[in-house]
Amino acid sequence: MLKRTPLFHAYETFGAKTIDFGGWELPVQFSSIKEEHEAVRTKAGLFDVSHMGEVEIKGQDALPFLQRLLTNDVSKLTDGKALYTAMCYEDGGTVDDLLVYQKEKNDYLLVINASNIEKDVEWLLQHQGENDVLIQNVSDEIALLALQGPLAADIMKDVADEEVTSLKPFTFLSKAEVAQKEVLVSRTGYTGEDGFEIYCQSEDAVHIWSALLKVGAPKGLIPCGLGARDTLRFEARLPLYGQELTKDISPLEGGIGFAVKTDKEANFIGKEALKKQKEEGPKRKLVGIEMIDKGIPRTDYPVFSGEKQIGVVTTGTQSPTLKKNVGLALIESSQAQLGTVVEVQVRKKRLKAKIVATPFYKRAK
């Protein structure tokens, strides 16, 4: 039996096409991936991402505990600020990538990937030791909506006060009102656009979803599915766990070295391995590839230089914004220079591609 979010029945109203996504029955699209993608790039889109996991970390030792588990420097956070980070194994492989929210001193919220909820919670509990921390998986109580796009703030102002719309990127309010319901709202997202993520009680999700679509529709807001979420995050070079980051791919290889602070005092799990990787330079690198020959690079397609396989495509598609066939590939660092011509094995053919700069899309500030 597939799991469903509190918004499942609202999908049907909009004719959503659902798929099995890591054990969840979720909408891959409502109208079309292309239309939803373009709405987020030019106007706004509303996503149900309630399948994501939320874990509360509270107690006297919350900070030292998180400093030991996470690669970024949590001590830099202040109340109302959020931080993107990774959690690693001793060998530098990635357990997960996540957001950490500091509500107040000794009170944090971790937002983790849906497919990793059980594994992550187990990992946290396994390392609790003597620390005075309470680790609570609250994923089932919380629904999560993402309002994304250049008109997100304009739409939000119709259902929330100025305190919400004036939030800076990576800041949040832990007790705000959106559509008369109490929520935690942050200026964050996974699309490469401006936007908000709204954490609400599961029973309030349908009300907030409907209220946002009601005020947003005249401005071009449409509901969006996982298909567009994937093409949007891909163009902005935001990694997806299981593709750009895995237990075998470190944050440095997966292109999120900025979230790894090997110079922080805390001796976090994976620090030695990642320090060594940083000093020697990772042996593999995440690069952009653009097809020269006709074909689309897809996840797990091998990448060759001559007869030698030098890596693999992690994500690829026809970019709706660029109208080009592009991909992200994890390849040997020695072959990663811009402009290098490589070959991608597309079914039985080897097709030419070149290494290009990423992100494929960056919004104008």
Swiss-Prot record:
UniProt keyword RNA-binding, yes or no: no
Annotated catalysed reactions: N(6)-[(R)-S(8)-aminomethyldihydrolipoyl]-L-lysyl-[protein] + (6S)-5,6,7,8-tetrahydrofolate = N(6)-[(R)-dihydrolipoyl]-L-lysyl-[protein] + (6R)-5,10-methylene-5,6,7,8-tetrahydrofolate + NH4(+)
UniProt entry tagged with the keyword Transferase: yes
EC number of this enzyme: 2.1.2.10
GO molecular function: aminomethyltransferase activity; transaminase activity
Xref: InterPro entries: GCS_T (IPR006223), GCS_T_bac (IPR022903), GCST_C (IPR013977), GCV_T_N (IPR006222), GcvT/YgfZ/DmdA (IPR028896), GcvT/YgfZ_C (IPR029043), TrmE/GcvT_dom1 (IPR027266)
Keyword vocabulary terms for this entry: Aminotransferase, Transferase
Coiled-coil regions listed in the entry: none
GO terms under biological process: glycine decarboxylation via glycine cleavage system
Disulfide bonds: none
GO cellular component terms listed in the entry, alphabetical order: cytosol; glycine cleavage complex
Tree of life domain: Bacteria
NCBIfam families xrefs: gcvT (TIGR00528), PRK00389.1 (NF001567)
Protein family membership: Belongs to the GcvT family.
Function of the molecule: The glycine cleavage system catalyzes the degradation of glycine.
Subunit and partners: The glycine cleavage system is composed of four proteins: P, T, L and H.
Protein name as catalogued: Aminomethyltransferase
Source organism of this protein record: Bacillus pumilus (strain SAFR-032)
